[in-house]
């Protein structure tokens, strides 16, 4: 039979292990950015829509459905889509909100070794935490080259 101190030691050790595995809001946001990148590369408009907030606003006032249609048009134009982060994410966290800036190379092609199109963009995004999930509320991108 375990004594009180032994039980306390086991409980504290389990609590410490649980605390170590808890994901921080910033890490969850970084994971969401990575899942959006994967959705674009997988040409999955449904997964893209899932990340966008209902009140999403993009360049020129494009809304959530407009952004999804823009992605679908790109998918029709290019059989393969590549998104490569060209440097680290610059994350600024605030309670319930965040902004993420990064450089991204976007490529599109027909499946051959070399892409048919490639462009580098400066991207600035705004995020909101909704029911434990990060949702993209705004995005602006400008060509770099």
Question: Which functions belong to the PLM regions below?
Answer:
Residues 55-57, 106-107, 143-144:
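Solvent-exposed loop/turn segments at secondary-structure junctions
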Residues 72-117:
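Surface-exposed, charged secondary-structure patches
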Residues 1-18:
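Sec-dependent bacterial lipoprotein signal peptides
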Residues 52, 87, 123:
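Residues that flank catalytic or metal-binding motifs in active/ligand-binding sites
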Residues 19-51, 68:
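Short, low-complexity N-terminal intrinsically disordered segments enriched in polar/charged residues
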Residues 51-64:
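A short gly/proline-enriched turn/hairpin at secondary-structure junctions
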Residues 22, 99, 117-145:
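Short beta-strand edge/turn micro-motifs at domain boundaries
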């Amino acid at each position: 039979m375990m004594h009180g101190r032994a039980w306390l030691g086991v409980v504290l050790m389990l609590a410490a292990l649980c605390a170590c595995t808890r994901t921080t809001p910033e890490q969850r946001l970084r994971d969401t950015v990575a899942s959006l990148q994967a959705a674009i590369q997988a040409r999955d408009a449904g997964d893209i829509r899932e990340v966008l907030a209902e009140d999403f606003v993009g360049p020129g006032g494009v809304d959530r459905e407009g952004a999804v249609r823009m992605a679908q048009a790109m998918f029709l134009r290019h059989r393969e889509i590549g998104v490569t982060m060209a440097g680290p994410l610059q994350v600024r966290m605030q309670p319930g909100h965040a902004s993420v800036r990064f450089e991204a190379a976007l490529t599109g092609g027909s499946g051959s070794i070399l892409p048919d199109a490639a462009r580098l963009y400066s991207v600035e995004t705004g995020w909101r935490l909704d029911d434990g999930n990060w949702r993209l509320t705004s995005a602006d991108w400008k060509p770099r080259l």
